[in-house]
A protein has these predicted regions:
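Catalytic core of pol beta-like nucleotidyltransferases
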Residues: 1-27, 33-40, 51-111
Length: 111
């Protein structure tokens, strides 16, 4: 799993990013968790929940997190939230491949 390898190279930095941005949970899905990943063209697909009730703060954290993850992974990152997924076919596709990679309640990387 490509995403696992990238995170394990800089585990402390990844954990700090998740804590700084108050991530409640973070899932990876799509090609980065399958054998379909292409090092030249694939992006990283992430599903995140931020633990912040203020919509402005939550939005600012999401934008900052997206920018930081693109720097961390050195590639394009698609960052989605549960509430942004309205298409049932997309939801089913995400649910079929998603893997929990960070649990904010335990402040632990799970890969």
């Amino acid at each position: 799993m490509v995403i696992k390898d990238e995170i394990l190279k800089r585990l402390t930095d990844f954990n700090a990013l998740c804590q700084l941005h108050k991530i409640k949970y973070l899932y990876a899905f799509g090609s980065s968790v399958t054998d379909r990943f292409n090092y030249d063209t694939s992006d990283i697909d992430l599903l995140v929940e931020i633990d912040d009730n203020d919509p402005i703060e939550r939005g600012e954290r999401l934008i900052s997190l997206w920018d930081n993850f693109e720097g961390f992974f050195h590639r394009k990152v698609d960052l989605l939230t549960d509430s942004s997924i309205r298409n049932p076919y997309l939801r089913k596709n995400i649910d079929s491949t998603k893997i929990l990679i960070y649990d904010g309640s335990r402040q632990k990387v799970l890969i």
